[in-house]
Amino acid sequence: MKKQKIFIACDTTNQNLIKKIITHTKTNKLNIGYKFGIEFFYSKNGRKFISKLKNEEVFLDLKLNDIPNTCAAAINAIKDLKNISYLTVHTSGGYEMLKAVKKVSKKINKKIKVLGITVLTSFSNSSIKKIGYTKSIKDIVKKQAAIAKLAKLDGIVCSGYEVKLLKKICNRMDIITPGIRLKGDSIGDQKRVMTPKDAFMNGATAIV
């Protein structure tokens, strides 16, 4: 049976802490990877630290969102990082941008999976309307997932509440679910959170 994939969010700039996290989470019982966002990537020697990780599955969560040429150039600028398994871009950047990112990523490293972020888990239906959206989060996610599929991305990032909906649209794509919390955990600035069990039951390919 295929092991369920869990990415541990390394949302810190403390490299010693991350080393301890990696050491203490090594196990054959679970399929563990490590997610590095812009906080760590832009920190002093963050990129260098990531480049030196060996035999670890690295999820580079840069959430790129710009014009096609700029995003493509940004991907090309990290071509020296040969250990990246997953890379994120915002689907709101549009079809042309997604297509450009996919093309360049496969050119520099065929193993990279490009994931399209739909709606951040920090948004609720009420808060997303405050920035100009008129449709529900599920409707927005559905539309953006369809664009990501058209651009031939490898996967989608969405909250656990949209997974079942996207399984019907993107049945052969990876579906990565962030905003994972255990019952009773503080949710911080997150709005759409879910337990690991419920996310996997809904059909998530991996959780963060």
Question: What function would you assign to each model-found segment?
Answer:
Residues 2-4, 70-155, 159-164, 169-172, ...:
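Conserved anion-binding
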Residues 5-10, 32-36, 58-62, 85-89, ...:
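Hydrophobic faces of well-ordered beta-strands that scaffold small-molecule active sites
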Residues 12-14, 38-42, 64-66, 93, ...:
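Active-site-proximal loop/turn and secondary-structure-junction residues that shape catalytic pockets
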Residues 28-29, 81-82, 151, 202-203:
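Structural motif
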Residues 36, 40, 44, 158-207:
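A C-terminal functional module that forms or caps the active site or interfaces directly
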Residues 13-25, 68-78, 137-147, 190-198:
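Short, acidic/polar
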Residues 8, 63, 148, 199:
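Residue-level signature of catalytic and energy-coupling elements of molecular machines
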Residues 10-52, 62, 68-71, 165-167:
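Conserved alpha/beta-domain cores
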